[in-house]
């Protein structure tokens, strides 16, 4: 899924990251944690799957599929280590991190959207109920990163649970997530006087609160009260995103699963695209194949763009017929166990590339393969983007689409590919959006590589045979110390492979 070339938030973020110089080692350092006390999970349905009620999804000790209480505790520990580093030189002897969950959002009266947890909240505790608060509080007499983790959760309510399903309650929240304590949500107000103290530095994202009501009830008054103190409320989001950049082995395994099942869904969708075909049918086929293989939801509304519509980068209407002889560009991904995939393929719906289609497709494929070889430690997405533009300028000249100097070819490349080469990937499609693309890549980072060439049918500068063609090829890549690990490697992209799949009989 494409993202914009730049964002105005980068300058302050880069400044903050300079203050964290050396903190990448914090992410890779070995930590010694006290064993997480094992607490018996209630033998009842909670507000989310548990090892007791869903043993086919979770093993004992896991909070979410594949991710244990120990992993979540380590994340909180690392976050408090970053808080400790950034707080040096500031007054305040106590530190409290506050992270809000998402609320339920409604599409119309009494009709909710499918609930999706705030990913920063989810990353730190794995709790998947709305209207909750996570608090990480430094321990008196102990140095950070020692802390106490607390959840404030909705109280169990038989009346509401009759309609909305079970809630975990405080006992379920503690046993499932492994936090130290849990309290009913309304008791958070009793913590506020301590947070207002001059000696307490509060870390909370007051500029973009994830839960408007909880912010208004609790955190906005606190933020305003501390605005004139020496210890103003400080943002924690950039620290959380700094952690989320580097995926653990368990996270990479979840992303491998998402990549594999999405690749299989692409294969089945390619096979089903017999011309003429409705974009809506391919949308439905792709979603079905993802869900049938275990995906929770699609990661985003997919682009299913036939013919000239592939030149609309975020085309999501998906309601037109794709004619015989046209290609379809499908940009789609799924979410599986909190982690997402993001893959794009372009293919002819009748199963055979025309000569101009194959010519343009092979050019994009060659650029994409060259960019994949650059996905190694020390380079950056910006470096790869610059290389993509250089290669694309040359390819556009080779194809006869442009006839200009080297400098003009670089400019033309931006015309025919107006988006970046990729973005970070993880729990979000456009993961860790405050992290600049100029950061050196490190082992454990996951990125997309997605060059494309788009030639609208009204572009009279291009040869007529290419007009109306749009091609993008996107893979998901784990940066390793050795060669890149392609999470979407099972998704065909060679011309011969695509044509064989589209022409198979069963």
UniProtKB/Swiss-Prot annotation:
The UniProt record lists the keyword Protein biosynthesis: no
Residues annotated to bind Mn(2+) 2: 331, 342, 474
Superkingdom of origin organism: Eukaryota
Cofactor requirement: Mn(2+)
Binding site for Mn(2+) 1: 342, 423, 450, 474
Organelle transit peptide: 1-31
Tissue specificity statement from the Swiss-Prot or TrEMBL entry: Expressed in the kidney, specifically in intercalated cells, but not in principal cells, of the distal convoluted tubule and cortical collecting duct (at protein level).
Record SMART domains: AMP_N (SM01011)
Keyword tags: Cytoplasm, Hydrolase, Manganese, Metal-binding, Mitochondrion, Transit peptide
Binding site for substrate: 300, 331, 342, 423, 430, 450, 474
Pfam families in the record: AMP_N, Peptidase_M24
Ranges for region Interaction with TNFRSF1B: 54-79
GO terms classed as biological process: glomerular filtration; protein processing; proteolysis
Disulphide-bonded residues: none
Family: Belongs to the peptidase M24B family.
Subunit structure: Homodimer. Interacts with TNFRSF1B/TNFR2 (activated) and TRAF2.
Protein name: Xaa-Pro aminopeptidase 3
UniProt organism field: Rattus norvegicus
